[in-house]
Amino acid sequence: MSSSPELGGVDFFAHGGLPVPQVTILQAERVAALFGLTVQAQPLGSQQDSNFLLADGGSVLGVLKIANPAFSAAEIEAQDAAAAHIAAACPDLRVATATHGPAEVPVDGGRALARVLRFLPGGTLAGAGRYLSPRVVAGLGAVAGQVSLALSSFEHPGLDRVLQWDLRHALRVVDALAGHVRDEDLRDRVTAAARAAWNRVEPLAGRLPWQAVHGDVTDDNVVCLLERGLRTPDGIIDFGDLTSSWAVGELAVAITSVLRHAGAEPCSVLPAVRAFHDLRPLSAAEAAALWPLVVLRAAVLVVSGEQQAAIDGVNDYVTGALEHERRLFERAMSVPAEVMTGLILAELGLAGEPLPTPSGVVVDLGRCAVLDLSAQSDAVDEGAWLEPGLEDRLAQALLAEGYDAVATRFGEARLTASRVLADHSPATVATGIDLWTAAPVEFPAGLTVTGEGNRVHVSLPVPDAPAVPPLVRPEYAKGWLALVADPAPLLGLPTATRPDEGDLLKRRAASFAAVQEHYYADPPRIERGWRHHLAATDGRVYLDMVNNVAVLGHSHPRVEAAVARQLRRLNTNSRFNYASVVEFSERLAGLLPAPLDTVFLVNSGSEAVDLALRLALVATGHQDVVAVREAYHGWTYASDAVSTSTADNPNALATRPPWVHAVDAPNSYRGRYRGSEAVRYSADAVLLIGELAGRGRPPAAFLAEPYYGNAGGMPLPDGYLAAVYAEVRRHGGLAIADEIQVGYGRLGRWFWGFEQQGVVPDVVTVAKATGNGYPLGAVVTSRAIAERYRDAGYFFSSTGGSPVASVVGLTVLDVIQDEGLQANAARVGAHLKARLEELAVRHALIGAVHGSGLYLGVEFVRDRGTLEPATEETMAICDRMLELGVIIQPTSDRMCVLKIKPPLCLDVAGADFFADALDRVLAEGW
């Protein structure tokens, strides 16, 4: 089996089209037999070669690659040598090296070289309907960087070839093949885009380093390690496009492939660019050439796909890719190359000097007011930012006050330009200044002025810049703002300063204890809330599905007014005699059944649980407590001692003091007893309490959430609390219901969680919802139990029950009643749960939907039989949901449950937006 004697490299322009060699499955199996392999062959898609997966029973032995007859022996040898070279240089990178061959074999139309390559399990990133996360995109860039570094020292005669995929020839390829594009409009746009991109690359060409390049480090050829539900790029296959070309082309080809994926847009490639740059630093010239090369690659893919389909119409791999290539091209063209280049340079720290600040006032505006439209502006309070025409009304009001002009701020992210329930960021960042003037103003040449009437937009673009819109999306702001200068100095206004949002996280890490964690690795900066929405400083508005603290909704005007009014009058400690503490205590006790009639007021849930336990210890004289596993109750010594959730404290079980005794979490979905067997949980708890009493250690209390909140809102088994409460009371103990998460109407049907169980506890703890974000908690018990606390001394909390805290508590109860929030929780919660249960029918990852009202949980499992928790997938889903405009977080000890605890003002539109976003994520990936 000798190699082909032909040594010259292929020349695409001489060969024209390269149809895939027609090889049947039987022929492929016969070729494999030449290498001593008895296998079953399965065809794989390819653009120019004929590929087959070779298997022996259930074992994959390799991939048979029969090269296009146009490729010489030297080219094939170079490919195998390059693969071996990379494998040696990058031991952590899996590489499809040759295991057998090459050998010359007959094919339809001539003879070709065949060999068997190592099979890399795990699958590729391919699939245009599949979403690629920033982590995966960065992994793609890292693979491209590793390959580029390794090949920088590789040389071989077989690199001397002229390929249509070599970006040095991109414009020539487009010109040669554009005639195959039947859609005239598309053809014209592709050729124009290629010409414009080439005009940007050509002046840089002399500064772009050459080397050996793989040429096809794309989603089709990067293989992933699949571990714990997540993909990590760690392998490379298919060296068929190996050649010598611009080194930066390796990255351009890689990131172009990202654009065909679900949800991708130009800024989606930045993690790959950064990862590549970290391994193989790009020069400023390479960074400047990168996006034009992406456009050229996209244009080549479109024309090549159309040409290949024309000459190889039976190739499903080719014809199926046409629509994806067109979509990829449209996305590459959706942002001007100048903007993407500026964005890339800024991301890599390669941007040149900022545009010079213009000097000298050229327009005298007189007395001018500056209008703040950011998320932190008082002008957008109480949801005013959602009102159409707010900017004009604010400006006209200032003009009416006597100002000669009103101006907005350059580079500011305007909350007034945002919108709610949006799956992508709107254009919020100003590229100029809007002006309202009391009298007409003459503007000199050099300023770009648009608009009519007494409102105009003034900008100062650089020469030859593309048309700059007045507002741009925050993801692209650095690119757009590199094309415009701040016109403020020319208008006699102060120059705007743009904060570095990353600096805030650094300052937090330096001054704020790191154990006080924040949501998300790269969190948005949230500075405003309204109802069930949270607004970031870049103008993006998120649907808040996790913030059960703001039970009424964020920034409720009645709470704000009540606090301000009371602060103007009095705020002191609860030892003084004032009405609000009495009124709130009466109202709260009035919501509970007898004999729960006496209230203690504290500042938090942790304090409430701590006090409840102290009450039980003093009232009973007992020293032990029974608590439920996988629960969280607080951070004080006592409340932490009974917190058994390993998600909140990995050492919770090992460090539990001897006076705390844990019973199994009554989880009817994945616990020891499931379904109808779940009634046995209460028997086990009763047995433990009896055993403790038999050893002379009867418990002072049994503490549990009456609705299993930490598991994602799961009801306890029927009769569970009735049986356990009866047993603990039989031995002189108290029943404590922790309502901090689940109470206050959140469950919809029941105001208190214990109502679902048909029981009355001896002590109830509440917090979170009681203050709608203001620090307020309470313990409610009977007069007899409360009086026993005197045996341990007196109780006092400086700000617990303060005038302001008490007024807040009263206002929250008023709003819950006046706005029908419990009924809303029942209605919207039922709608949302039905939507989620419908998703569970279509998406196997959803194992169960738990909960009631607006305390719901979606539990993700990898297998509905074994219930293996999908922990990593859940966190990745939360990250993707954030990108789509939803704030959601995981819960449970396995961190595989989405905890759905939004403000009770959530409406059906918000519920549907959440369900639709989750459906999209589960369909497209995370």
What name fits each language-model region?
Residues 21-32, 153-156, 172-215, 225-228, ...:
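An alpha-helical support segment within catalytic cores of ATP-dependent transferases
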Residues 44-58, 63-64, 98, 198-249:
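Active-site acidic catalytic loop and adjacent metal/ATP-binding pocket
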Residues 66-110, 128, 134-138:
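A conserved alpha-helical element in kinase catalytic cores
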Residues 127-186, 208-210, 623-641, 645-652:
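A cross-family kinase active-site recognition segment
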Residues 177-180, 301-353:
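ATP/Mg2+ or Mg2+-diphosphate-binding catalytic cores
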Residues 247-281, 295-313:
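Active-site activation/catalytic loop segments of kinase-like enzymes and analogous catalytic loops
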Residues 344-440, 464-499:
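Polar/charged, compositionally biased leader and regulatory segments
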Residues 496-926:
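Conserved N-terminal phosphate-binding loop of PLP-dependent enzymes in the Aspartate aminotransferase
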